[in-house]
């Protein structure tokens, strides 16, 4: 039975939904330690997907509860929502996750209203929370002061971060990490009496790895510090390496990786700490990396509207070959592309709009192994017409008139995805040196292999569908033909029956909808003969159906293959010689 409710009660109902979401989020996250200790790798993948889907499930549940308990005339009176927002602000004021609570409020509002009603009066378009709150914080880091004895500090770290599974070889790992730190850092650092090591108290879990994250610092300098840990089944926990290079740590927190599972009592505090380690990362990316992808979306949107308000930047079509399914535009000064689905696809494409959306959701939920760009989905973006170059707007209106609409002096984009901008691999290779070409083509092959190991087949593997990041990594970003590797039927081309068969424009053999012939890859992927020959030397096994069938067999047997987000260093024996 519907009834009247004061604004404070509606605010409390919204907050109750948020509490239910946060409780279940923490429950899934807290299970990461046990999954790591028990080597439950498939369960870890399922938990990751479950946590991603949790947000929308709980928003829908909360919206349904509000609709069931309140009259539409009361709930959908937009004039009341500034009062509800004020009541909500008072209720979240002392929370340690208040910025997440604001984003939750926005999600509930958008679940009830069309985007026509968005304003800072009814929603948190801009946050009301200061970036650093003055109230008490829970202690979040552990600090170690070697005082010239780095080995002793490392022993204390090993003691403080114990698991219910023993270390495989504690003494070996201590020697290795000590040697690596002396090797990676300037000579004077490890001897500096003022050197300190600060580590986040919570362990970061993802896929088959666990990570201790922090920094080394002196009064004048600092270095990021990451200890990756592995659980070798039947052997125990081992410290795999140590990373102190900012670029390598940045890759571990990349937009191409799955989200970490990490206990986060105070999200803003953890993000601020990570920002000090990785100043090149935007807040949006850091929130997203620790599982708060909706907060990442809020931070991204705020950065976008600020950029548009404070610069003369205008939208242009993204460089590269025009897509058959998606149209892509960008802001030159904002490191993002915006992707919309065209109204009509090239006849060679067999997908429809619903399938494309499903493919993007598949990527969102799957382990991206550092080779798939994360995306954010937006509805009803509104931008001034003046922020578009005329040629860009004309092309968008031509290819997607059902998605892009001009309403007076505003451009409405009904649906789009945002994605990190990269240099298309085909364009990168046009200007690459011989060494850069070799490195890029090698990484291109590694990207395909690592995706395959994660049960992902890109489908359309043309160079134009891969991008090169600022760190030089090759990443796949065209998802309309992506599928699970185990769905593909890899075949050898049958021998021709007659000499005439080889001259025919049509195949002399039947081809099913999921059939793929790796022998055709060289001609299909490379027009440039030098690149074709080089790739055959680097990754020729990709042209053999047996290679793909072998991976499929391992996946069907339940094996989760190792893909490391960092360069693995020398063995202890090599390093300690």
Swiss-Prot record:
What does the entry list as the binding residues for ATP?
318-324, 339
Keywords per UniProt: ATP-binding, Cytoplasm, Glyoxylate bypass, Hydrolase, Kinase, Nucleotide-binding, Protein phosphatase, Serine/threonine-protein kinase, Transferase, Tricarboxylic acid cycle
Q: Mind telling me which GO cellular component terms the entry cites?
A: cytoplasm
Q: Where in the cell is it found?
A: Cytoplasm
Taxonomically, the superkingdom here is Bacteria
Q: Where are the transmembrane segments?
A: none
According to its UniProt record, the EC number is 2.7.11.5, 3.1.3.-
- Residues of the active site are 374
PANTHER family, alphabetically? ISOCITRATE DEHYDROGENASE KINASE_PHOSPHATASE (PTHR39559:SF1), PTHR39559
**Which HAMAP family is this protein grouped with?**
AceK
- Protein name, UniProt field: Isocitrate dehydrogenase kinase/phosphatase
Q: Which organism is it from?
A: Pseudomonas paraeruginosa (strain DSM 24068 / PA7) (Pseudomonas aeruginosa (strain PA7))
The organism's taxonomy opens as: Bacteria, Pseudomonadati, Pseudomonadota, Gammaproteobacteria, Pseudomonadales
């Amino acid at each position: 039975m519907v009834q009247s409710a004061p604004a404070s009660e509606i605010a409390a109902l919204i907050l109750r939904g948020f509490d239910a979401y946060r409780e279940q989020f923490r429950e899934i996250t807290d299970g990461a330690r046990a999954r790591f200790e028990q080597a439950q790798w498939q369960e870890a993948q399922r938990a990751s997907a479950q946590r991603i889907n949790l947000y929308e499930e709980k928003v829908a549940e909360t919206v349904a509860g509000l609709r069931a308990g309140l009259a539409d005339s009361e709930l959908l009176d937009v004039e009341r929502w500034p009062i509800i927002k004020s009541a909500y602000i008072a209720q979240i004021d002392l929370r340690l996750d208040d910025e997440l609570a604001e984003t939750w409020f926005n999600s509930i509002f958008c679940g009830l209203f069309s985007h026509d009603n968005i304003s800072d009066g009814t929603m948190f378009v801009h946050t009301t929370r200061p970036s650093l709150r003055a109230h008490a914080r829970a202690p979040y880091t552990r600090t170690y002061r070697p005082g010239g004895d780095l080995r002793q500090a490392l022993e204390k770290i090993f003691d403080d971060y114990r698991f219910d599974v023993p270390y495989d070889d504690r003494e070996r790992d201590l020697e290795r990490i000590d040697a690596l730190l002396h090797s990676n850092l300037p000579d004077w650092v490890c001897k500096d009496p003022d050197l300190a090591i600060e580590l986040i108290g919570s362990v970061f879990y993802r896929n088959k790895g666990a990570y201790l994250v922090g920094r080394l610092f002196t009064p004048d300098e600092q270095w990021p510090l990451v200890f990756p840990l592995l659980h070798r089944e039947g052997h125990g926990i081992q410290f795999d390496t140590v990373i102190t290079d900012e670029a390598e740590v940045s890759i571990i927190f990349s937009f191409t990786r799955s989200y970490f599972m990490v206990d986060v009592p105070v999200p803003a505090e953890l993000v601020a700490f990570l920002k000090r380690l990785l100043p090149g990362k935007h807040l949006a990316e850091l929130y997203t990396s620790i599982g708060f992808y909706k907060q990442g979306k809020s931070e991204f949107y705020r950065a976008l509207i600020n950029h548009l308000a404070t610069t003369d930047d205008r939208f242009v079509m993204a460089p590269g070959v025009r897509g058959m399914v998606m149209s892509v535009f960008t802001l030159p000064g904002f490191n993002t592309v915006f992707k919309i689905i065209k109204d009509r696809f090239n006849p060679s494409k067999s997908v429809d709009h619903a399938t494309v959306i499903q493919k993007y959701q598949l990527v969102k939920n799957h382990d991206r192994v550092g080779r798939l760009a994360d995306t954010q989905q937006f509805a009803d973006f509104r931008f001034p017409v003046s922020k578009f170059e005329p040629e860009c707007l004309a092309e968008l209106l031509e290819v997607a008139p059902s998605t892009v609409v001009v309403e007076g002096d505003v451009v409405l984009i009904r649906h789009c995805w945002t994605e990190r901008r990269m240099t298309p691999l085909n364009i990168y290779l046009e200007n690459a040196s011989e060494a850069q070409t070799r490195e890029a083509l090698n990484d291109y092959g590694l990207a395909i292999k690592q995706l395959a190991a994660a049960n992902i087949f890109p489908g359309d593997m043309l160079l134009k569908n891969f991008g090169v990041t600022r760190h030089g990594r090759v990443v796949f970003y065209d998802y309309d033909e992506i599928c699970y590797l185990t769905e593909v039927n890899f075949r050898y081309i049958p021998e021709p029956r007659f000499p005439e068969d080889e001259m025919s424009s049509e195949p002399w053999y039947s081809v099913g909808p999921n059939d793929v012939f790796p022998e055709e890859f060289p001609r299909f992927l490379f027009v440039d003969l030098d690149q074709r020959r080089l790739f055959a030397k680097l990754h020729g096994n990709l042209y053999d159906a047996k290679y793909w069938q072998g991976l499929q067999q391992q996946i069907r047997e339940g094996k989760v293959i190792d893909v490391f987000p960092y360069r693995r260093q020398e063995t202890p024996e090599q390093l300690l010689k």
